[in-house]
Protein backbone atom coordinates (compact mmCIF):
# COMPACT_ATOMS: atom_id res chain seq x y z
CA UNK A 1 0.00 0.00 0.00
CA UNK A 2 1.20 3.50 -0.81
CA UNK A 3 0.14 6.92 0.38
CA UNK A 4 -1.51 9.01 -2.33
CA UNK A 5 1.85 10.74 -3.00
CA UNK A 6 3.42 7.34 -3.79
CA UNK A 7 5.33 6.94 -0.52
CA UNK A 8 5.17 3.30 0.60
CA UNK A 9 3.45 2.54 3.89
CA UNK A 10 4.36 -0.49 5.96
CA UNK A 11 3.12 -2.06 9.12
CA UNK A 12 5.55 -1.98 12.04
CA UNK A 13 6.23 -5.72 11.67
CA UNK A 14 7.03 -5.19 7.95
CA UNK A 15 4.36 -7.67 6.86
CA UNK A 16 1.06 -7.24 5.08
CA UNK A 17 -1.89 -8.71 6.97
CA UNK A 18 -4.44 -8.83 4.15
CA UNK A 19 -8.05 -7.96 4.86
CA UNK A 20 -8.69 -7.36 8.56
CA UNK A 21 -11.49 -5.68 10.48
CA UNK A 22 -10.99 -2.25 11.99
CA UNK A 23 -11.19 -3.96 15.38
CA UNK A 24 -8.34 -6.35 14.49
CA UNK A 25 -6.31 -3.41 13.20
CA UNK A 26 -6.76 -1.56 16.51
CA UNK A 27 -5.96 -4.63 18.63
CA UNK A 28 -2.80 -5.47 16.71
CA UNK A 29 -1.75 -1.90 15.83
CA UNK A 30 -1.83 -2.48 12.08
CA UNK A 31 -1.08 0.75 10.19
CA UNK A 32 -2.46 0.20 6.70
CA UNK A 33 -6.15 -0.21 7.69
CA UNK A 34 -5.95 2.98 9.79
CA UNK A 35 -4.71 4.95 6.80
CA UNK A 36 -7.28 3.35 4.49
CA UNK A 37 -10.13 4.27 6.86
CA UNK A 38 -8.92 7.87 7.18
CA UNK A 39 -8.52 8.07 3.40
CA UNK A 40 -12.13 6.90 2.97
CA UNK A 41 -13.43 9.41 5.55
CA UNK A 42 -10.96 12.07 4.29
CA UNK A 43 -8.04 13.48 6.27
CA UNK A 44 -10.05 16.70 6.78
CA UNK A 45 -12.68 14.81 8.79
CA UNK A 46 -9.96 13.30 11.00
CA UNK A 47 -8.31 16.71 11.37
CA UNK A 48 -11.61 18.30 12.44
CA UNK A 49 -12.18 15.62 15.09
CA UNK A 50 -8.70 16.18 16.52
CA UNK A 51 -9.36 19.93 16.70
CA UNK A 52 -12.58 19.22 18.64
CA UNK A 53 -10.55 16.98 20.97
CA UNK A 54 -8.28 19.89 21.91
CA UNK A 55 -5.20 19.17 19.78
CA UNK A 56 -3.79 22.69 19.69
CA UNK A 57 -0.73 22.41 17.45
CA UNK A 58 -2.46 21.12 14.33
CA UNK A 59 -1.69 22.90 11.09
CA UNK A 60 -4.38 22.94 8.41
CA UNK A 61 -1.63 23.56 5.87
CA UNK A 62 0.51 20.55 6.85
CA UNK A 63 -1.63 18.07 8.80
CA UNK A 64 -4.66 17.38 6.58
CA UNK A 65 -2.86 14.34 5.18
CA UNK A 66 -3.05 10.55 5.33
CA UNK A 67 -0.22 10.11 7.91
CA UNK A 68 -2.54 11.86 10.38
CA UNK A 69 -4.13 8.41 10.86
CA UNK A 70 -0.88 7.25 12.48
CA UNK A 71 -0.23 10.35 14.56
CA UNK A 72 1.69 12.16 11.83
CA UNK A 73 1.23 15.65 13.25
CA UNK A 74 3.81 18.20 12.10
CA UNK A 75 4.22 20.02 15.41
CA UNK A 76 3.37 17.07 17.64
CA UNK A 77 0.92 16.58 20.45
CA UNK A 78 1.44 16.81 24.20
CA UNK A 79 0.77 13.97 26.60
CA UNK A 80 -1.84 16.22 28.21
CA UNK A 81 -3.72 16.64 24.91
CA UNK A 82 -3.51 12.91 24.20
CA UNK A 83 -4.73 12.10 27.71
CA UNK A 84 -7.66 14.52 27.33
CA UNK A 85 -8.64 12.89 24.02
CA UNK A 86 -8.60 9.43 25.60
CA UNK A 87 -10.62 10.79 28.54
CA UNK A 88 -13.25 11.83 25.99
CA UNK A 89 -13.42 8.24 24.74
CA UNK A 90 -13.77 7.03 28.33
CA UNK A 91 -16.51 9.61 28.94
CA UNK A 92 -18.81 8.51 26.14
CA UNK A 93 -17.40 10.87 23.50
CA UNK A 94 -17.56 13.99 25.67
CA UNK A 95 -14.48 16.23 25.65
CA UNK A 96 -13.59 18.39 28.62
CA UNK A 97 -10.63 20.75 28.62
CA UNK A 98 -8.08 19.43 31.14
CA UNK A 99 -7.83 21.25 34.46
CA UNK A 100 -5.21 20.92 37.16
CA UNK A 101 -7.46 21.89 40.05
CA UNK A 102 -11.17 22.12 40.69
CA UNK A 103 -11.39 24.60 43.54
CA UNK A 104 -9.05 26.71 45.68
CA UNK A 105 -10.24 27.95 49.07
CA UNK A 106 -8.67 30.01 51.81
CA UNK A 107 -8.35 28.88 55.43
CA UNK A 108 -11.92 30.07 56.14
CA UNK A 109 -13.41 28.05 53.31
CA UNK A 110 -13.99 31.01 51.01
CA UNK A 111 -13.68 30.01 47.38
CA UNK A 112 -10.81 31.89 45.75
CA UNK A 113 -10.77 30.09 42.42
CA UNK A 114 -13.55 27.86 41.15
CA UNK A 115 -12.91 25.54 38.24
CA UNK A 116 -15.65 23.01 38.97
CA UNK A 117 -17.84 23.90 36.01
CA UNK A 118 -15.95 22.28 33.15
CA UNK A 119 -18.57 21.90 30.45
CA UNK A 120 -18.36 18.94 28.15
CA UNK A 121 -18.58 19.07 24.37
CA UNK A 122 -20.00 15.98 22.65
CA UNK A 123 -17.37 15.20 20.00
CA UNK A 124 -18.69 11.82 18.87
CA UNK A 125 -21.56 9.51 19.73
CA UNK A 126 -21.52 7.51 22.95
CA UNK A 127 -22.03 4.35 20.87
CA UNK A 128 -18.85 5.15 18.92
CA UNK A 129 -16.94 5.65 22.18
CA UNK A 130 -18.29 2.34 23.47
CA UNK A 131 -17.18 0.41 20.38
CA UNK A 132 -13.75 2.01 20.50
CA UNK A 133 -13.41 1.31 24.22
CA UNK A 134 -14.33 -2.32 23.69
CA UNK A 135 -11.71 -2.74 20.96
CA UNK A 136 -9.10 -1.01 23.13
CA UNK A 137 -9.93 -3.32 26.04
CA UNK A 138 -8.89 -6.15 23.73
CA UNK A 139 -5.62 -4.32 22.98
CA UNK A 140 -4.78 -5.01 26.64
CA UNK A 141 -6.25 -8.51 26.70
CA UNK A 142 -4.75 -9.98 23.55
CA UNK A 143 -3.09 -7.27 21.48
CA UNK A 144 -0.06 -5.01 21.50
CA UNK A 145 -0.82 -3.67 25.00
CA UNK A 146 -0.88 -6.93 26.97
CA UNK A 147 1.97 -5.68 29.17
CA UNK A 148 -0.28 -2.85 30.40
CA UNK A 149 -3.15 -5.15 31.41
CA UNK A 150 -4.42 -4.67 34.95
CA UNK A 151 -5.74 -7.43 37.16
CA UNK A 152 -9.22 -6.95 38.64
CA UNK A 153 -9.97 -3.71 36.77
CA UNK A 154 -11.34 -2.80 33.37
CA UNK A 155 -8.80 -0.90 31.32
CA UNK A 156 -8.52 0.12 27.69
CA UNK A 157 -5.68 1.60 25.70
CA UNK A 158 -3.67 1.83 22.53
CA UNK A 159 0.00 1.48 21.73
CA UNK A 160 1.90 3.46 19.13
CA UNK A 161 5.40 3.30 17.70
CA UNK A 162 7.29 5.52 15.26
CA UNK A 163 9.73 4.34 12.61
CA UNK A 164 12.63 2.39 14.11
CA UNK A 165 10.83 2.52 17.49
CA UNK A 166 12.38 5.88 18.39
CA UNK A 167 9.12 6.90 20.03
CA UNK A 168 6.87 4.55 21.99
CA UNK A 169 3.47 5.74 23.17
CA UNK A 170 0.76 4.20 25.29
CA UNK A 171 -2.48 5.96 26.13
CA UNK A 172 -5.28 4.39 28.07
CA UNK A 173 -7.85 4.58 30.80
CA UNK A 174 -9.59 2.78 33.64
CA UNK A 175 -12.94 3.77 35.12
CA UNK A 176 -10.97 6.16 37.38
CA UNK A 177 -7.93 7.48 35.54
CA UNK A 178 -6.66 8.32 32.07
CA UNK A 179 -2.98 8.58 31.17
CA UNK A 180 -0.59 8.82 28.25
CA UNK A 181 3.05 7.76 28.38
CA UNK A 182 5.65 8.70 25.81
CA UNK A 183 9.12 7.17 25.80
CA UNK A 184 11.72 8.33 23.29
CA UNK A 185 15.39 8.23 22.44
CA UNK A 186 17.58 9.98 19.87
Show which residues each predicted segment covers.
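Short acidic, glycine/proline-rich loop/turn micro-motifs
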Residues: 6-7, 61-65, 114-117
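The feature captures the short pre-catalytic strand/loop hairpin that immediately precedes
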Residues: 58-62, 183-186
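Charge-rich, low-complexity amphipathic helices
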Residues: 9, 47-48, 72, 107-108, ...
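A penicillin-recognizing enzyme superfamily signal
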Residues: 24, 28, 75-186
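Active-site-adjacent helix/loop patches that line small-molecule binding or acyl-intermediate pockets
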Residues: 1-3, 13-57, 63-91, 137-138
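Short, glycine/proline-biased beta-turn/loop segments that scaffold the active-site neighborhood
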Residues: 1-19, 96-110
Amino acid sequence: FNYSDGTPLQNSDLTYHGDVTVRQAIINSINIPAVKVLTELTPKVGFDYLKKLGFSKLSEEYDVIQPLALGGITYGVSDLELTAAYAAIADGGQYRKPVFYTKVTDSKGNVLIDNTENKATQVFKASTASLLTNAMEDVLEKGTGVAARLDNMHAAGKTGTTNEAKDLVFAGFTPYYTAAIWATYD
